[in-house]
A protein has these predicted regions:
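N-terminal helical capping/dimerization or prosegment-like subdomains
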Residues: 1-93, 319, 323, 336
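An extended, acidic, His-containing surface patch that forms the Zn2+-binding/catalytic region
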Residues: 74, 183, 241-319, 331-340, ...
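Active-site metal-coordination/substrate-binding segment of hydrolases
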Residues: 76-147, 438
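A common structural junction motif
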Residues: 86, 233-237, 342-352
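A generic structural motif
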Residues: 116, 207-209, 325-334, 363
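Histidine/acidic-residue-rich, glycine-tolerant segments that coordinate divalent metal ions
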Residues: 140-221
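A short core secondary-structure module
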Residues: 216-238
Length: 454
């Protein structure tokens, strides 16, 4: 890698990244559909400037997919790069120190929505290719770029595209930089991702809201009902009361558990800096790694119903809605969990309540075999640039398309430059600027090594 690339181009790189991060490409909010298209157009322009002879905007029933192919180098291996240009909503907006779409650097950290998830990492991959593109007169690898705009909202455009055109997955390796270091100074490669089952639970207990004075004491309350149903579905100890769930889980191997036990872990720092909480919850007999990586979880994301405006209104709400999700681990398919969750809700719903589960999006968990030689190359690239090889860990999060990316037969390398306190999905999301510069060098070095230039 050109060792002076970042030093020489730093101002330009930051200006370009600020442009990208300034686009509020929130995929789940319809009002931002035009912004998602602007972000896609920005990426298309980047690929064109990089010299890609084939750049396409692939349309579907949702936000478009950006596709690009680098100039073909005969005999060189092909890497498929995946990332996403959409971002999470910014609520609660009043907790941001600086506006989420006004990128701001403070103390060597760049704050903006999408700084690490995933615009900053997409940018790092693009610039890594730029850094090695002209070395020795030609790029060391062929690169296919696949950037979607619905990773955060669970859309189907990229799934439909790859189902119809599976040849786009043909590559010698798939590189996904949407993850992070295990800890500062500890780069990681990921052996598993949890899947997702996201749904809304709708409950109705009467035809209309009722006067709490006239009917309090006899009328069923929809908010109370939905809360009781939810706490019946998830016990105080964190146990999920969904039939056949735990029995279907594929447990981690003894080797994997031993690897986790060797990792540095500061419980108090984890509580203070990552959870920002006084204590942990969950199944106490399971380790923190097991709870966050190897066991399913059930979370409640929001409840609406009744009166939540300023002042007082004394009603007994007739309806309520809860947004819920389960994170799935190997052994639990999305379709299986949908069926079991339906049965579980039937078991806890009172006779007086009408209810409906509406499934919004999801994906299967992913288990990855890291024995492929490509992982050893990535390991060497990290060691050369940051001085430490990767550790093998799992991720608690989900990348819906990950279960599809490897179906073409290529190994899927899940890695990234994030740090645990980067605040993904939270106010004041950030990326450490030096991590980004290191990432450009790491991925550029990986391209060169994978292409045989080491």
């Amino acid at each position: 890698v050109d060792s002076q690339f970042v030093t020489r181009e730093k101002d330009r790189l930051l200006a370009e990244l600020f442009e990208f991060l300034s686009i509020p490409s929130i995929s789940t909010l319809p009002d931002h559909a035009a912004d998602c298209r602007r972000a896609a157009d920005w990426l298309m322009n980047q690929l064109t400037v990089l010299g890609c002879p084939r750049v396409e905007l692939l349309e579907g029933n949702g936000h478009p997919v950006v596709w690009g192919e680098s100039p073909e180098v005969a005999g060189a291996p092909t890497i498929l790069i995946y990332g996403h240009y959409d971002v999470q909503p910014v609520d609660p907006i009043d907790e941001w120190v600086s506006p989420p779409f006004t990128p701001t650097i403070r103390d060597g950290k760049l704050y903006a929505r999408g700084a690490i998830d995933d615009k900053g990492q997409v940018f790092t991959l693009l610039k890594a290719y730029e850094a090695v593109r002209d070395a020795d007169g030609r790029p060391p690898v062929n690169v296919r770029f696949l950037f979607e705009g619905e990773e955060e909202c669970g859309g189907d455009v990229v799934f439909d595209l790859l189902a119809a055109q599976p040849e786009r997955l043909r590559a010698d390796a798939v590189l996904v930089a949407d993850m992070g270091y295990y800890a500062e100074g500890w780069p990681a490669v990921y052996t598993a991702l949890r899947g997702m089952c996201y749904a809304e639970l709708h409950v109705r207990t009467s035809e209309r809201d009722l006067h709490s004075g006239h009917y309090g004491g006899v009328a069923p309350n929809a908010i109370e009902t939905i809360c009781r149903m939810l706490t019946d579905l998830k016990g105080r100890d964190g146990t999920i009361n969904v039939p056949n769930l735990y029995e279907s889980v594929i447990p981690p191997s003894d080797t994997e558990r031993a690897g986790w036990e060797s990792l540095p872990f500061d419980r108090e720092k984890f509580l203070r800096e990552e959870l920002t909480a006084k204590s942990m919850t969950g199944i106490e007999s399971a380790s923190v790694f097991e709870r966050t990586w190897a066991l399913p979880t059930f979370e409640f994301h929001g409840i609406r119903g009744g009166f939540t405006g300023e002042g007082a209104k004394t009603v007994i709400p007739a309806s309520a809605v809860a947004k819920i999700s389960l994170r799935l681990v190997p052994g639990l398919s999305l379709e299986f969990v949908k069926q079991q969750l339906q049965l579980a809700v039937e078991n806890v719903a009172p006779d007086y309540a009408q209810w409906e589960l509406r499934f919004l999006h999801g994906g299967d968990p992913v288990l990855i075999d890291v024995d492929h030689p490509a992982f050893a190359v990535l390991d060497r690239a990290f060691e050369e640039v940051v001085g430490r090889r990767t550790v093998a860990v799992r991720a608690g999060g989900s990348i819906p398309i990950a279960s599809v990316l490897g179906t073409g037969g290529a190994p899927v390398l899940l890695t990234g430059i994030g740090l645990p306190d980067d605040g993904l999905h939270s106010p004041n999301e950030k990326v450490t600027v030096q991590q980004m510069w290191d990432g450009i060098r790491v991925f550029g070095t990986f391209f060169e090594m994978f292409g045989g230039r080491d």
